[in-house]
Amino acid sequence: MPASFPLLAVDIGNTSTVLGLADESLSLTHTWRIRTNRDLLPDDLALQLHGLFTLAGAPMPRAAVLSSVAPPLGANYAFALRRHFRVDAFEVAAENLPDVTVELDQPGSIGADRLCNLFGAERYLDAYEYAVVVDFGTSTNFDVIARGRRFLGGILATGAQVSADALFARAAKLPRITLEAPARAIGQNTVHALQSGLVFGYAEMVDGLLRRVRAELPAPAVAIATGGFARTIEGICREIDFYDETLTLRGLVELWASREAVGKGL
């Protein structure tokens, strides 16, 4: 097996951290989703990683790539990998990707996960000039991408669970519910009425924003949903074309491979 594989990809979000091992074909052979815990020290993370690999019967990584929206935790992962696995992780940032054009007022402010989505969406651009990745996480991000690795901008909205938590915190008599779609829009009890408003209402917001984005682009755009909440609204949003649960993680792997190819002059 080449020295750079297995490759460990780590996407550290505000709520969840998604990890995957990729082989030399850049296919994800193992994936995990764990809760993001900012209190974990490098040695804690090393034990956690070793436990995940061991339980899955997976090989230890020989290279790593990190995307983090929690910089202190990203640094702890990098230190844990270096100290305990002898792996120097590549940490994603706009300044490390010269082949990417970030068309923002402040290009350096782009989040690492947005760049991963750009690479993950490339396979959908064969038939389209533009793509919109809707990433359902703690926040819901709309990433607008064009061929040629151009990040055009996006939309940032409150995540569905955050909206629900805010409602429950302000209305003490409302029951905390599971965010899932009810059978019909007109609820005949409190739980179903809440589910209709929170799930169907959220889907309508997503559809409306996608229509606005498409109206501003000069050519058709493909829309792809990813992130934890994407499973809940799958089939409900009419404007989303594809659901790709591993888009960000796969984009992280392909971003790393692209950088390696540039470094080797391929």
Curated annotation (Swiss-Prot):
Alphabetically ordered keywords of this record: ATP-binding, Coenzyme A biosynthesis, Cytoplasm, Kinase, Metal-binding, Nucleotide-binding, Potassium, Transferase
InterPro entries tied to this protein: ATPase_NBD, Type_III_PanK
Subcellular location(s) of the protein: Cytoplasm
Keyword Nucleotide-binding among UniProt keywords: yes
A single GO cellular-component term on record: cytoplasm
Residues reported to bind ATP: 11-18, 138
Highest taxon of the lineage: Bacteria
Catalytic activity: (R)-pantothenate + ATP = (R)-4'-phosphopantothenate + ADP + H(+)
Major location (coarse): cytoplasm
SUPFAM superfamilies: Actin-like ATPase domain
CC cofactor: NH4(+); K(+)
Cofactor annotation comment: A monovalent cation. Ammonium or potassium.
Class in the EC hierarchy, top level: transferase
Enzyme Commission number(s) of this protein: 2.7.1.33
Gene Ontology annotations of biological process type: coenzyme A biosynthetic process
Residues the entry annotates as binding K(+): 135
Entry binding sites for substrate: 111-114, 190
Protein's UniProt keywords contain Cytoplasm: yes
Gene Ontology MF terms in the entry: ATP binding; metal ion binding; pantothenate kinase activity
Pathway(s): Cofactor biosynthesis; coenzyme A biosynthesis; CoA from (R)-pantothenate: step 1/5
Residue numbers annotated as active site: 113
Quaternary data: Homodimer.
Stated role: Catalyzes the phosphorylation of pantothenate (Pan), the first step in CoA biosynthesis.
Family: Belongs to the type III pantothenate kinase family.
Name of protein: Type III pantothenate kinase
High-level lineage: Bacteria, Thermotogati, Deinococcota, Deinococci, Deinococcales
Gene: coaX
